[in-house]
Swiss-Prot record:
Residues where Phosphoserine is found: S248
UniProt protein name: Voltage-dependent calcium channel gamma-3 subunit
Subunit text: The L-type calcium channel is composed of five subunits: alpha-1, alpha-2/delta, beta and gamma. Acts as an auxiliary subunit for AMPA-selective glutamate receptors (AMPARs). Found in a complex with GRIA1, GRIA2, GRIA3, GRIA4, CNIH2, CNIH3, CACNG2, CACNG4, CACNG5, CACNG7 and CACNG8. Interacts with AP4M1 and GRIA1; associates GRIA1 with the adaptor protein complex 4 (AP-4) to target GRIA1 to the somatodendritic compartment of neurons.
Gene encoding the protein: Cacng3
Role: Regulates the trafficking to the somatodendritic compartment and gating properties of AMPA-selective glutamate receptors (AMPARs). Promotes their targeting to the cell membrane and synapses and modulates their gating properties by slowing their rates of activation, deactivation and desensitization. Does not show subunit-specific AMPA receptor regulation and regulates all AMPAR subunits. Thought to stabilize the calcium channel in an inactivated (closed) state.
Any one GO BP annotation for this protein: regulation of AMPA receptor activity
Residue ranges crossing the lipid bilayer per the database entry: 8-28, 104-124, 135-155, 181-201
Chief subcellular location: membrane
Region feature (Disordered): 232-253
GO terms under cellular component: AMPA glutamate receptor complex; dendrite; excitatory synapse; glutamatergic synapse; postsynaptic density membrane; Schaffer collateral - CA1 synapse; somatodendritic compartment
Cell location: Membrane
Length: 315
């Protein structure tokens, strides 16, 4: 189950990396970030005279160009002038910096670059030995690319909302599919980054638990010697120790008691307290001893009287 989950996570990471990079590249390279009504201005020289034609038409713009969709200049695109001559920037320095950042488009370009390196790390993780360290690098690249992307989107929205040169000419505007491609790229990049970091953390925990268990096993086996070695060690220690053959303190105590001292522990009987039972017991003991003493004598006499047991000497 874990292998299946890990395979799904790697699939999500690979597909997401490709999708995020493709969407952001298309968004940066196309001119459909914003639809608005504006004036298409063009210059034409005829007979050393410059004629200006101003016409309010529907336009679509990207990060660097604006193209006309209607009127006499339909299909004509021109470079966006973020610093027109009639604009006064000395009164508002923040707006000037915003226009400079908007003109450079540094954050969208940085996002594309980070997504590219993140995709390379994901591809390298399939072949590199330390794949999990490469996956961690990919996660960092994707998270950074997403942050750069969202900063660029915020700067773009702020620049369009606070553009004094087009505030009067623009009556309505809406964001195009290039803008939404960039937004989707941000979401996918963050998801891929989180999944990549999760893969690294999970694998790192598994490796740490495995190494900890192996270390415990090694330490346990190192402390306990083999059975044969322990058995030999015990037998050798028993044979070499001089005290092992000595008697225990309890047995020493029993064996050291002399036979002469036994009388000290015997209890004397009072002859006045002798009963009939004690007299019968004494008679039985006397009869038993008499029979025991007489039996060997009778047995010896039978052996001597038996002619089969007599020794015969040859004549």
């Amino acid at each position: 189950m874990r292998m299946c989950d890990r395979g799904i996570q790697m699939l999500i990471t690979t597909v997401g990396a490709f999708a995020a990079f493709s969407l952001m590249t298309i968004a940066v390279g196309t001119d459909y970030w914003l639809y608005s009504r504006g004036v298409c201005r063009t210059k034409s020289t005829s007979d050393n005279e410059t004629s200006r034609k101003n016409e309010e038409v529907m336009t679509h713009s990207g990060l660097w160009r604006t193209c006309c969709l209607e009127g006499a200049f339909r299909g004509v695109c021109k470079k966006i002038d973020h610093f027109p001559e009639d604009a006064d920037y000395e009164q508002d320095t923040a707006e000037y910096l915003l226009r400079a950042v908007r003109a450079s488009s540094v954050f969208p370009i940085l996002s594309v670059t980070l997504l590219f390196f993140g995709g390379l790390c994901v591809a390298a993780s399939e072949f590199h030995r330390s794949r999990h360290s490469v996956i961690l690098s990919a996660g960092i690249f994707f998270v950074s690319a997403g942050l750069s992307n969202i900063i660029g989107i915020i700067v773009y929205i702020s620049a369009n909302a606070g553009d004094p040169g087009q505030r009067d000419s623009k009556k309505s505007y809406s964001y195009g599919w290039s803008f939404y491609f960039g937004a989707f790229s941000f979401i996918i990049a963050e998801i891929v980054g989180v999944v990549a970091v999760h893969i690294y953390i999970e694998k790192h925990q598994q490796l740490r638990a495995r190494s900890h268990s192996e270390l415990l096993k090694k330490s346990t086996f190192a402390r306990l010697p083999p059975y044969r070695y322990r058995f030999r060690r015990r037998s050798s220690s028993r044979s070499t120790e001089p005290r092992s053959r000595d008697l225990s303190p309890i047995s020493k105590g029993f064996h050291t008691i002399p036979s002469t001292d036994i009388s000290m522990f015997t209890l004397s009987r009072d002859p006045s307290k002798l009963t009939m039972g004690t007299l019968l017991n004494s008679d039985r003991d006397h009869a038993f001893l008499q029979f025991h003493n007489s039996t060997p004598k009778e047995f010896k006499e039978s052996l001597h009287n038996n002619p089969a047991n007599r020794r015969t000497t040859p004549v």
